[in-house]
A protein has these predicted regions:
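Conserved lysine of the Walker
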Residues: 301
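Short beta-strand-centered segment that lines the nucleotide-binding/catalytic pocket of NTP-utilizing
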Residues: 314-332
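Conserved NTP phosphate-binding and transfer environment spanning the P-loop NTPase/kinase superfamily
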Residues: 286, 409-553
């Protein structure tokens, strides 16, 4: 007699008995579910698993499609796998680096020893399509880590060997397409035929791998030029070469060699050098009266503003700092979003008329009294703080909407210098596994919300999708308007954040949806060796989130 287990399916709120050891694909078929763009993965007791996964105990299961972040990641990782196999098939001795998310896709550095040309891209694209059309199964293997290390040593994959040796894991999962072997952090699809849409184009010195849009998986994400953003990534690559650290394996080896203090000091010095350079550029522009500093949530705007103000003072200017948070309209005047919640992410939550009126008055040499927004009462009040600008004063204004043209529509543009700050992670797990640029911002916010606002990690994770939606609508479209960009991510920061975030993530209960993201982040942080945060200087931007800063917030 066959043994059976009980599965509760969240998609249709039905229960059904299935044979013990059934794969998630078997279970999906048993429930006779229909998904246009899936399933690509599933939450099993709120842990994301691939459709290869076999179930041996009664579980709650929710199947995910391409409109979910977890599903989109599984699809994207599988595209990486097929791309790397295609390159190996055509150029066997060539290294491939899945580098950075840019232009709604991923920049791919292919090291041919010569410039990449259009024909290279066309050949690789055709080979990828052949692999997809061949409907090749993607097989999953779990072995002792030392066995996986030996496998990748034999392949000559130095970066994976370094990562796995320092991961601390007893067992490691790897995947195969045909005879091609690779390791990926996270779930993959089960067959190459599930990759129904992709794009591959020449982009700068490499290639751009394009993926389906999260909002509409029937089309590729819109390709947009992000020249300034791309330059910031390249700048950080140069910084990494100074430190000799490109991947987490490199980083962990440096920590084991007791180089953590050097890494911190050099990283902080490089960031301060960049801030000083921006200040010099501002000072060299005659007539600039307003410095606008924008960036997404937890990008470190406040500390960046304070450090930039210090460097402006070094250049002979007298900065006056203003936060756009004090220009919110009264709560009852705030527009609501589709869910009926007050939409504080919208630029129309700010009193745009008052901003333009007061800034122009200041530029004319008049005295103004700044407002102060009371977040508890939801009311704008007079602050008693009066400002008047002299010839060598400059306003330094920070806020998420600072680069939106509507904010300063009535201010002469020659008086404005725009700075965009964001935490763009450039360290890689290894050459085929990138780190999402949003992960360190989410982790920063989890720590800050708990430490300063009494908000749990579960609640911060719950709110994060709406924060991201607001950024996509109100912040990212204007980032290329910046005169200068500042990457606030520190090479070492995830090693420090690990020590503060892990206890908070461990408090997220298993029976809530947010557990899936908490579990993913905990699994991800395990790759990093920890660094105590008391090693950071008091002016470090990270102290805005971790505490112990010499700045007053």
């Amino acid at each position: 007699m066959k043994q059976v287990i009980q599965i509760r399916c969240k998609n249709n709120k039905k229960s059904q008995k299935v044979e013990i050891g059934s794969t998630l694909f078997d279970i999906f078929s048993a429930f006779d579910l229909k998904m246009t763009h899936g399933p690509v993965s599933a939450r099993v007791n709120n842990k994301v698993e691939g459709m290869h996964y076999r179930v041996y105990n009664s579980k709650d299961v929710e199947f995910l499609d391409m409109t979910s972040s977890s599903g989109s990641r599984a699809y994207t990782r599988t595209l990486f796998f097929v791309l790397c196999k295609a390159v190996q098939d055509i150029y066997p001795a060539t290294d491939v680096v899945i580098d950075i998310p840019v232009s709604n896709g991923f920049y791919v550095d292919i090291r041919l020893g010569r410039p990449v040309v259009d024909e290279d891209v066309n050949i690789i694209r055709r080979r990828m399509q052949e692999i997809i059309d061949a409907r090749m199964p993607i097989r999953r293997f779990t072995v002792p880590t030392e066995e996986a290390v030996a496998l990748f040593q034999e392949k000559g994959d130095v970066e994976k060997v370094k990562l796995l040796k320092t991961s601390g894991s007893i067992y490691t999962t790897y995947y195969k397409i045909g005879d091609y072997v690779d390791y990926y952090y996270g779930t993959l699809l089960t067959n190459t035929s599930q990759l129904y849409l992709f794009g591959l184009e020449k982009y700068y010195d490499g290639m751009l791998l394009r993926i389906p849009s999260l909002k509409n998986p029937d089309v590729l994400g819109e390709m947009t030029r992000q020249d300034k953003m791309f330059e910031i990534f390249k700048e950080h690559h140069r910084w990494q070469s100074i430190l000799g650290i490109r991947t987490v394996g490199d980083f962990n080896q440096a920590i084991d060699a007791n180089h953590s203090t050097d890494i911190i000091n050099i990283s902080e010095a490089l960031q301060e050098k960049k801030i000083a350079k921006i200040a010099e550029e501002i000072a060299s522009r005659k007539g600039v009266k307003l410095v606008l500093l924008a960036g997404p949530s937890s990008s470190g705007k406040t500390t960046s503003c304070k450090r930039l103000s210090i460097q402006l003072a070094v250049n002979g200017l007298k900065p006056l700092q203003i936060s756009l948070d004090d220009y919110f309209v009264d709560r009852e005047k705030t527009l609501k979003d589709a869910s009926g919640e007050y939409d504080y992410e919208s630029i129309y939550a700010l009193d745009l008329d008052l901003i333009n009126e007061q800034f122009n008055a200041l530029f004319r040499g008049e005295e103004v009294e700044l407002p102060k927004y009371d977040f508890q009462s939801g009311k704008s009040k007079k602050s008693g703080n009066k400002l008047k600008m002299n010839d060598n004063n400059v306003l330094v204004v920070e806020g998420i909407h600072a680069l939106n043209p509507e904010l300063t529509a009535h201010i002469p543009q020659e008086q404005i210098f725009r700075v965009y700050a964001s935490a763009l992670t450039t360290i890689l797990l290894d050459n085929h596994n990138y780190i999402p640029t949003t992960d360190n911002r989410l982790l920063r916010r989890i720590i800050r919300d708990y430490k300063y606002r009494g908000v749990s990690a579960q609640e911060t994770i719950h709110r994060w999708p709406s924060v991201r939606a607001g950024e996509n609508k109100w912040i990212f479209p204007f980032q290329e308007n910046a005169d200068a960009m500042l990457n606030t991510a520190m090479l070492y920061e995830l090693a420090v954040i690990k020590t503060q975030a892990e206890p908070l993530l461990q408090q997220v209960p298993e029976n809530c949806e947010e557990y899936a993201e908490a579990y993913r982040l905990l699994k991800f942080l395990k790759y990093f060796k920890g660094i105590p945060y008391n090693n950071l200087p008091p002016t470090s931007l990270l102290r805005e989130f971790l505490g112990g800063s010499s700045f007053h917030y």
